[in-house]
Amino acid sequence: MILVDFWATWCGPCKMAMKQMKPMKKDLEGKDIVYVFIAGENSPKETWDNIIPDIHGEHYRVTAAQWKYLSKQFSIQGVPTYIIVDKEGAVIQKHTGFPGVDTVKKELMKALEK
């Protein structure tokens, strides 16, 4: 399963959510979950490079064209946006805005049970 986090370095709520989810990620360590973080090139590279070492997961900084494509494919209206993708590759949950750690953890646990 994959939790995709569309975010930006200049997005205060994005960074706050990452900090709040850190203990949850530790609790779920060893579970079959991959964390993917996607930021656009409107996030300055130097700032992005300084932030990502503290965030466990796979990190991608995409071009404006790639961001536009992903935004269209996943109907991204703003950041942060969270998408949970199941083992078959289906999007099973999407949130624009941080829904809270409890909600994210509950949805991940439910998806793991399938």
Give residue ranges: language-model regions.
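Short active-site neighborhood of thiol/selenol oxidoreductases, capturing the structured segment around
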Residues: M1-K15, M21
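Hydrophobic beta-strand anchors of alpha/beta hydrolase catalytic cores
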Residues: L3-V4, Y35, Y82
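Cofactor-binding loop segments of dinucleotide-utilizing enzymes, especially the Rossmann-like FAD-
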Residues: F6, G40, K87
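Conserved Rossmann-like nucleotide-cofactor binding loop
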Residues: T9, S43, A90
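Structural microenvironment flanking redox-active thiols in thiol-disulfide oxidoreductases
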Residues: M16-D54, A65-K72
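A general structural signal for alpha-helical elements within enzymatic catalytic domains
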Residues: K26-E29, M109, E113
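Thiol/disulfide oxidoreductase modules built on the thioredoxin-like
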Residues: I55, V62-L112
